[in-house]
Amino acid sequence: MEKSFVKRVFAFFLILAAFAFLSLPQAFAEPKGTVVMFHAGSLTMPFEAMEKEFEARYPGVDLQREASGSQAAARKVTDLNKPCDIMASADFKVIDKLLIPKHADWNIRFATNELVLCYTDKSKFAKEVNAKNWYNILQRKGVVWGHSDPNLDPCGYRALMVLQLAEKYYKKPGLYEKILANRPVENIRPKSVELVSLLQTGNMDYAWEYRSVAVQHNLKYVSLPDKINLGNYKEDPYYSQAVVKVTGKKPGEYMEMKGASTTYGITLIKNAPNQEAAVAFLEYMLNPKGGLKILKDQGQPPFIPCRVPTQKMKSTLPEKLQKLVEVKD
């Protein structure tokens, strides 16, 4: 009889344990489903590598990415109302100006970069161009050079900022307009990475790109002084002299983008269809041993730890992300 009683007690606790296990919160379950991300074109190669690594860890998740200029990515959310979980911008200010507060609550700064002038062995004056004469070569007849659309892609307005700053740095009045006079409108492309194929096929001699893009595509490039390359935060007061007007939130509206060091931002869209899996990806991406390592390996310096400007913003982050972020303006 005692044995029978023990068996019944054991069975009772076994059933209780089963119920407890089945009633565990969903947080303990692996994320699954589709995660949609709109991101800057310059992040295509590192995000491709992250996608493979993340999906290997979480086979139930399908990360679907759309690359474009950063403003274009934001407008897919604001104007086209396309379903989206995560938006990553080559300029964190695009998130601040176009997505917060209506479409996003916070903005994590995760990496930096700098502008370089890219070329190949096929480029005219490839053996001659350097950091001291590049602005003269871009004015030469027959030289084909371009940049991305400032209204769609931060690399586009940053390229114009570099030219404005070069005029001041080299003390050459009128240099900005003279260089632009040798760049036809058709050499302005929707996103900076589209210029890479034009360089590689010999259809363009020079193009403004981020250093990380140049490294990832094995392009030759001219490195510029810190005073004009938008790559050193200590030079932000000098960079702020450059201002470019671009299209704003609504048709007919414009906003001024002021020169500053190149800083990338990422956010979770408020009505994210798959918030759980999106946060899992962000937790992986912002980890120094995860996505940030891939960025570093591909020539783009990450912030370790990543940053938000205020404690108030940090407190709005999902709990899993707060440990990966510091408060630093």
From Swiss-Prot:
The keyword S-adenosyl-L-methionine does not apply. Residues 1-29 form the signal peptide. One of its GO terms (molecular function) is tungstate binding. Keywords: Signal. It holds the Pfam family SBP_bac_11. Belongs to the bacterial solute-binding protein 1 family. WtpA subfamily. This is Uncharacterized solute-binding protein SYNAS_25580.
